[in-house]
Amino acid sequence: MKKLILALAAVALLGTAAQAQKINKEALLQKIEKNETASADAKKGAKAATWLNLGKSYVEAILAPTKDLYVGEPGLQLSLSLGDPKSIDEVTINGLSVAAQNYDYVTVYVSNGQVIGWKEIEPVKEGAIDKAIAALNKAYELDSKQGPKVKEQLMAISNYCSQLGDACNNIGEYKLGSEAFETAFRAEMSPACGTPDASRLYYAGYLAAA
């Protein structure tokens, strides 16, 4: 299995067009700060659009580290979607040797040439999910006509969390997976989303008991 690790490292280092994971954290945080300031303004804070924009900026920061990542993605494709890993370790998951590719914001686990899961190391914005849900619910509260736009952002959160839940389950991080599915369900509990998908809650409970 050492050969697998060395092969993956060689592929990453030989890709001249590939770069380290690039996320413009400063720009994302500046956008959030701008929208937070607007939401605190008495006049602007009374408008649904202000809160929708705030929610969008949180969602953008949430999705940035893993936006092009998915379970089953070819490992060789990671250099294009995420850039070069900082390092590659050999780890054992469920008795199998797996390549753990370490990036600034996420560690991606590759087995048999495919991504089997990942674990986020550092968020772009701490607490962004809870803040996004609150901002989007506020937007809907102020103007229910914004419902479709609010739902789009909330479903982006739910889908992100569900994918994270699957990814964590595959690498034995059951507690993190359970929390991710619970958050996915919570995002869908907004009136803008209608009836939440009960399977999110089922998987949250299933992984909590694993």
Model-inferred region functions:
Residues 1-28:
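Bacterial Sec-dependent N-terminal signal peptides
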Residues 22, 50, 57, 167, ...:
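Residue-level signature for tetratricopeptide repeat
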Residues 45, 57-175, 188-198:
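Short coil/linker segments at helix-helix boundaries
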Residues 53, 163, 197, 203-206:
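Canonical tetratricopeptide repeat
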